[in-house]
Every structure is written in C-alpha cells, then in structure tokens.
C-alpha cells in the first residue's frame, strides 16, 4: 500500500487504485487489485503472476501497463521537526542515518548510489519492508533511530497523520 494513492481500507483503495479499476471496468476488462508489500509485488511481476504496478518510480517503467501517466509524485526529504539538517548535495547524506524501504529506488544520481554503498551499515542506511514500512520509518525518525527519509510528500503526510506524529516532522 502507498496511501493516499494505493491503500486497502474500509474507506477505499486509494485514488489511483479506484481510477485504474474504473478505467478497466469501462473498457469491459476485469481487473483485480492485490495489496502486497512492494518487494513482493516486483517479484510477482517477474514471475508473471501480476500484470503491473499502480505506482512506479523512475527506472521501473517496464512494469507500466499504460502509455500515459495518471499522476506524479513529489518526492522530498523529511526530518524531525527539531532537526537542523538540510540537503546540500550528496555529501549531506554522509552526516545522517538514511531510512528507506527495501526495494524502492529513490534517485539515480545521489540517493540510490548512497543506499547501495551503505546498505549493510545501519549507522548510515536502514532499509525495512512490510505493509506499513513508510509509517514505521516515520516513527523511527521521530524516535531518533534514523535521521532522514526521502519519499512522496502526500504519502508522508498521510502516514505521519495515521501514526499521530505529523507535527513531529518537517
């Protein structure tokens, strides 16, 4: 899940999921949405069990099943509200513990190389997986276990609100 885009709740499945299912229905096609962790979704696509993903990051275009985008993410850095850290190029990542989600691609030029280089060093990079990975990373950040995360601003706002820590991050 990647709320508010993709979610599985009593209130709906997220606006991207609802839109895609409606498009398929209007085209007379049957479609099913399965809510699984991102890394598993990638593996199921590679095995031929899933047809596509609803939310993609750069470098994952081969999983796209439409020619047109239906929306865009606005990725940015987030820190604790009391943090003085600011992005000032690649070297600024050297001073913090970066938290991310296993299987995600962030940014080919700066973040991905940093994650690849330090993914085995929990003092530099901590990657987690699971249905609530984004919310857990936000909570880890508010507790001081990681210093910075990089993700979509709407997804962060939603997850932080759900975790009750929206005022503790910026």
Please name every model-derived segment.
Residues 1-7, 90-108:
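Short loop->beta-strand "edge-of-pocket" segments that line small-molecule binding or catalytic clefts
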Residues 1-63, 130:
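Extracytoplasmic small-molecule ligand-binding "clamshell" domains
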Residues 20, 41-44, 134-140, 146, ...:
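Short, hydrophobic alpha-helical packing/hinge segments within bilobed ligand-binding/sensory domains
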Residues 20-29, 68-70, 103-131, 138, ...:
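Ligand-binding cleft/hinge of the Venus flytrap
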Residues 65-78, 91-94, 170:
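Short Pro/Gly-enriched coil loops immediately N-terminal to beta-strands
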Residues 80-99, 113-114:
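Flexible hinge/capping segments at coil-to-helix
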């Amino acid at each position: 899940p990647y709320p508010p885009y993709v979610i599985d709740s009593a209130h709906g499945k997220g606006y991207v999921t609802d839109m895609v299912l409606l498009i398929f229905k209007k085209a007379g096609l049957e479609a099913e949405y399965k809510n699984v962790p991102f890394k598993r979704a990638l593996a199921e696509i590679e095995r031929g069990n899933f047809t596509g993903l609803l939310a993609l990051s750069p470098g994952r275009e081969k999983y796209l099943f439409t020619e047109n985008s239906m929306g865009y993410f606005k990725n940015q850095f987030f820190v604790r509200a009391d943090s003085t850290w600011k992005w000032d190029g690649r070297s600024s990542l050297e001073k913090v513990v970066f938290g991310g989600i296993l299987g995600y691609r962030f940014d080919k030029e700066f973040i991905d190389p940093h994650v690849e280089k330090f993914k085995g060093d929990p003092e530099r990079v901590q990657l987690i997986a699971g249905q609530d990975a984004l919310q857990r990373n936000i909570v880890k950040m508010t507790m001081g276990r990681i210093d910075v995360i990089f993700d979509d601003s709407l997804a962060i706002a939603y997850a932080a609100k759900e975790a009750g820590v929206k005022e503790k991050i910026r």
